[in-house]
Amino acid sequence: MKNFLLFLLLGISFFSFGKKPDTRYFEMRIYYCHPGRLDALLQRFSNHTTKIFEKHGMTNVGYWIPTNNTDNALYYILAYPSKADRDSSWKHFSSDPEWKTVSKKSEETGKIVAKVTSVFMNATDFSPKIKPSGGAVDQVFELRTYSQLPGRNPAILARFKD
């Protein structure tokens, strides 16, 4: 599962390559919702959470739902200038009065999230610059997992770079 998460950015095919490497610290979070609660989570993110993230210095990179969402999950990626900035942003977000109000109100009919997982990532030097598609066409993204033997990580990175 961790490898699956690690290569999310590699599977997004509509990005264009940038000239400078992206030095931001990325976090992919997966929220697994209680049955019947995914819509409440999506509404909370759409109406409140993404704006509160931005308020605390988090960059919303993207949000995805699996096409076959048997896990009732939301996948999303945030970017921060550094790990220290990430930690500070989450500390301030968690104590934000607006967030506390929104969270409490959205869970009046029951808890929304059953489990959260996170994967922390740094962009490779050949990662494309991330920019939105801006198109009206529905897009499906494929997240591939590549497993390699110990010590072979440089070889797979070279394969994608070259």
Language-model features, listed with the residues they occupy:
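Sec-dependent N-terminal signal peptides
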Residues: 3-13
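Short S/T/G/P-rich N-terminal loop/turn motif that feeds into the first structured element of a domain
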Residues: 14-162
